[in-house]
From Swiss-Prot:
Organism: Streptomyces coelicolor (strain ATCC BAA-471 / A3(2) / M145)
Lineage of the species this protein comes from: Bacteria, Bacillati, Actinomycetota, Actinomycetes, Kitasatosporales
Ranges occupied by TPR repeats: 823-856, 863-896, 942-975
Domain of life assignment: Bacteria
The protein's name in its UniProt record: Regulatory protein AfsR
Similarity-based family: Belongs to the AfsR/DnrI/RedD regulatory family.
Amino acid sequence: MDGGPRVPEQRRPGFPAEEEESGALRFGVLGPVRAWRDGETLATGSPQQRALLAALLLREGRTATAGELIDALWGEEPPSQALAAVRTYASRLRKVLDPGVLVSESGGYAVRGLAEGALDLARAQDLASAAEKARSAGDLCHARDLLRRALDLWDGEVLAGVPGPYAQTQRVRLGEWRLQLLETRLDMDLDQGCHAEAVSELTALTAAHPLRERLRELLMLALYRSGRQAEALAVYADTRRLLADELGVDPRPGLQELQQRILQADPALAELSAATAETATATLRPAQLPATVSDFTGRAAFVRELSDVLSAASGESASGRVMAVSALAGIGGVGKTTLAVHVAHRARAAFPDGQLYVDLQGAGARPAEPETVLGSFLRALGTADSAIPDSLEERAALYRSVLDGRRVLVLLDNARDAAQVRPLLPGTDGCAALVTARVRMVDLAGAHLVDLDVMAPEEALALFTKIVGEERVASERQAALDVVGACGFLPLAIRIAASRLAARRTWTVSVLAAKLADERRRLDELQAGDQAVEATFELGYGQLEPAQARAFRLLGLADGPDISLAAAAAVLDLPAQDTEDLLESLVDTSLLESAAPGRYRFHDLVRLYARACAERTERDGNAPSERGAALSRLLDFYLATAAGVYAIERPGDRLVDGLEPTEYPGLTFTEGSAALDWLYTEAAPLLACVRQSAGTARLRRAVDLLWAAKDLTESGANSHQYEATARAMCDATGSAADTRAEGRARTVLSDVLLVSGRIEHAEEEARLAMRLAGSAEDSAAVSWVANNRGLVCLHQRRYAEGKGLFHQAIAGFRATDNRAGEASALSNLSRAQLGMGNVAEAVDIARQGLAVYAELGRTMRLANGHFALGVALTRAGRHEEALGEFAEALDLFGDHRQRLWEGATNFRLAEVHLAAGRPSSAAQHAEQALALGCIGGDRMRGNVLALLGRALSALGQADRARACWREALSLYEQHDAQEVGEVRALLARSVAR
């Protein structure tokens, strides 16, 4: 048959490609009326002809008489030739569609024989029905996904461009149905804790449908659960005023009740639904517990005691659900971690929303900082890096909010003291924490304290037997008792001794007992507990092969909480496979732990012993300088790899050419995603390596490693640790009187301070860095710090001074052929020109910067170029062009996981939309900026809130606008920002109206 004219077009959203390739017809009415075959659009004719097709499709196979079709197309005033026109339209459509699809019968027409799901509306109905069933069954995750797929089938206005009263009626009907689906999906979003994400969408929807109270109710709840109580109450005030002005009525009872519950801070408002507690999003369900040992033995009374406490938290006890904390105290090696991990694994089913674990390194020289731990926990719970605040208090509050309504078990291992632990505790019922420490945490309020002593002799013997084997122990029971006694009944010592015997099939238990007795006599000056552990370590170490002993000594030197296989290979100067074989053999002897595939760590007592062995070996002249050489290789490995990551993320940036040379190679990556994954995964051991190099000949390389890893400054989870390391290196380089190294250290510190919005402190560091870099004739640092100082000037509105600094940076970058640096300074110079009122020059300079970025490839830095040009075009009033630039920037920032820059771009999009008279779109983008966070910390958040207030004011939401301005004013006042006066004026004008 004649298939009719066909126009190639992209596949219709919502229809799977495999279905379209089958040759079957597909139709769309949830947008323009269209038809497809094999992915190509069919010509469906004039608007009236499409109106006829839509009327037949929406009758779902039922016959429409000619009279009904005439009424549908023209209503009460049809043309004189209406019947002939209907017949003509039907005839033309038959030629386009498959045979037998449009049929004539009983004086009318019908569409028949369509494949299942051929009509987008039918697919949406099926998906919505399936979503309702999933929701009723308690599977909210699946229900949300189904509703999202249903809503994605809409492609603009229903029956767009189709005339006639029938089409108008269907537009209203299907528009109302879509809103109902949206409300249902948003309700489930809130049930599953997606509060911040929902605020943006709800803000836009309430602006588009201001009298729809259900949307207002959802917005109030989303704001309240996002910690924005004042705005939530302001939404109610705006709604009450609007309903009174427009309809002369009060808000419905449900909305009034919600307002009262918010005023009373009703704790039930913060709770998620019961279904949500059972079906928490899988991707946000961490399972971080270390593996439990297969030979766990004894401690039955402690297991019962701790399990009972966890049962109270999980709601399985008679008293109902509580927030439970248990703190285990005992000497090193007594088995605190083993017991806690064993109990935690037994209780996993009672905490279906996840289990968090951290080694707090409380017995080490550098215990983990609560800020850093909270950052890692928040990331594991699904919080974006950009949404993680800087301060300990804010991180702890966000952590408690994220855990609210969830049932999560937190294992805080090897804690230093209660002060380290308190910020890491959940805040609501249903969660629990297990804490291990060497001190009794009597000052940890409400904690159930457990004192763990050495094992009873029979328990110790049972553990020894389980590792060695019943057959070998049965005939030498007394010797076995002598062994566990010589181990001081400490589980760690018993495990190491037993593992050594298990690996020596020719030894008897008596031989092991005699060797331990000899070691203890040699170490009789030690205290009893230390004596037992040291003797066990000596025995284990003394039986290692030379290669194993060397690996044991050198791996203990690194300060990080753990070490990757690749980094360990650098420490040992061995191929990866040989390194893995050695490390796994040490795991078999219980001298090393496998924290995760490809990652290893020491028990802190074993690490101390390994370092003592390294010192002793070097002191005795058996391996001169092996410690320094090993740590130097580790630093080289991190520096070379981080430099490679930097080069991938910043092509054309010659900074890497000026780094200290390395003798040991690093890893190589072919694409940015894997490179950034490595950097974020290795953040803690990498920064530990930097700090460990202070006061050594490795100082300059350590500072360069900090510089090469500067992407960590924009990672919310790592920024605090990075800043602390930068400050430590500033002190170390100052003490060493190394001007070049100190200049670079202070340059990266000024970066951190700029990103977090601490402008005055950033200026202090940048000025000092420039003086130091100039004295050291470090041209790379001079150019970058000039750029940083220029950015400080932009924040402080000292535009002419900033312009001079950017010109200095551009000249320096050009002198060293640093194209990426040149592009960055050009983009910033554009902003300085804007501040001085030179809009045309700003646009031209921004285009120059973008052109340089474009030469370097489609990288994250190209996004910075589009961003800068978008800002300039906005000031020039060229709003549509600006939107295009920001859209390009947003895509690139998203591809490179630069969420803070995504937030900044959404802020700029909000500016454009507001300037173009689209306050609803402006409010939506401002909300997205708040959810993502922005470069600039609290000051930038103040800017976003001030802009959001302007958009809401334009939408008639005066109370919520004032709430935003008040919060912005509070943030500005904390930082003594120049915008204080502007926001006060906005508030004054708003109140005066």
